[in-house]
Amino acid sequence: KRSIISKSSAIGKGTIVQSEVNVSAECNIGKFVKLNTFCNIMHNSIIEDYTTIAPNAVLLGNVKTGKLCYIGSNATILPNICICDNVVVGAGAVVTKDITTPGTYVGVPARLLKDI
């Protein structure tokens, strides 16, 4: 099955894009990122190096993730959110505000479960 990557988006060296991934306009995907099946990266988003986006995760417009992050299956990151380095977002979590402290975040809305 095919993935769709906008011509205006950039994909870094060593990044893995699995099937049925959607990367829309003006996105910048870093080096050695993993985009799992059925994830959606919406316009003007930035994913820093060594980050994993799990299956069915959705990053809505203008989202920025730091380095070494893990966005869990079926997680949703709302528009205009920034996530710092070294953050784990649990499966099904909904991130409604910026995350500025490294750690594990779970729930709806996402809240800090554990510091890293």
Predicted regions and their residues:
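Structural signal for interior beta-strand "rungs" in well-ordered beta-sheet cores
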Residues: S3-V106, A110-L113
